[in-house]
Amino acid sequence: DIHKSYDRKTMWYDHTNKKGGEFLYVREQEVYLNMCRRWRDIPKPTIAMVHGACVAGGCMLAWVCDLIIASSDAFFADPVVRMGIPGVEYFAHPYELNPRIAKEFLFLGERMSAARAYEMGMVNKVVDKSELKKVTNEMAEKIADMPRLGLTLTKQAINHVEDLQGLSLIHI
């Protein structure tokens, strides 16, 4: 339930005073952070097609894509602060949203509509649900017609700028 608050003791049980905690840390770092970094660094452009709920880890997976197209009924949320967690492992919130909006997004844990996500620059396009697949495929086809080397070098350059701004310093 998106509106439910969670007892932190429940979450802490899985993460404190347990043998093999180092294994859990390494596993989470690999499964979440490193996986996201590898997806982000794929040389070819990637597009997230979002409809419905995009919550916590869903945001993490969408944000590593180069472009995000959302249906008008989509929403984004990250209620993990209510669980006593400071965000998902791939903590890109202040890069995807400006820092003040990222704080609002996390502190309140409320849903952000696709329209607001577009206004904040998190989403490239918002389209009717019935048009989502068509519009996404059309964009992918246009990109696929571009010279590969130019796309790869452009993506690397923009990712490098994000890294210089601190995105590469994200860690668990």
Where are the model-predicted features located?
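Crotonase-fold acyl-CoA enzyme core
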Residues: 37-151
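Short, solvent-exposed polar/charged micro-motifs at secondary-structure junctions
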Residues: 137, 162-163
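Conserved small/polar residues in nucleotide/adenosyl-binding loops
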Residues: 170-172
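Glycine- (often His-adjacent) and acidic-residue-rich active-site loop
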Residues: 1-34
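Short beta-strand->loop
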Residues: 164-168
